């Protein structure tokens, strides 16, 4: 997909930006694809860049993603927790699988979804092949990741591990309002003014 460009006029003349770079100037990051290593590296770099620009100002992360690689998603998750800036998360369209984990990983009180968004949580998917020993190793790793991710969902929602294990056994779909009641987000929003970046709290 070709990324559109926007023209900005200043006292120095006109300058063309690709749309994502222009949004980055306003501290907006867009995750609008499946999560893989390349996408994760870009998102991580954008988070680190915005922190270096102003560690006391918030970041808005918009999510419209079906999920993807667990390790790539966890790289983004860890960086969101690592940077000093509060990261607001906003679901537009869908946040499924690792996309849902990134949505709920936003700063407390700053996790949002637009009214017609869809959120889905489930256990990590994986396939094993090769020798029996290799299959056993891969199966144990999938179980470890499942336990770890369920623990993160417990941490951010306050539910018991028993409920999360039950709910993620199969695809668990929620509307924006369902996700709010579940604790994945804090508010269903329609107007942007609610989610403008705010200064980081004093350390």
Curated annotation (Swiss-Prot):
Any one GO MF annotation of this record: ATPase binding
Active site: 97 (nucleophile), 122
SUPFAM superfamilies, sorted: ClpP/crotonase
InterPro entries: ClpP, ClpP/crotonase-like_dom_sf, ClpP/TepA, ClpP_His_AS, ClpP_Ser_AS
GO cellular component entries: cytoplasm; endopeptidase Clp complex
This protein's record includes keyword Transcription: no
Similarity comment text for this entry: Belongs to the peptidase S14 family.
Protein name per Swiss-Prot or TrEMBL: ATP-dependent Clp protease proteolytic subunit 2
Gene that encodes the chain: clpP2
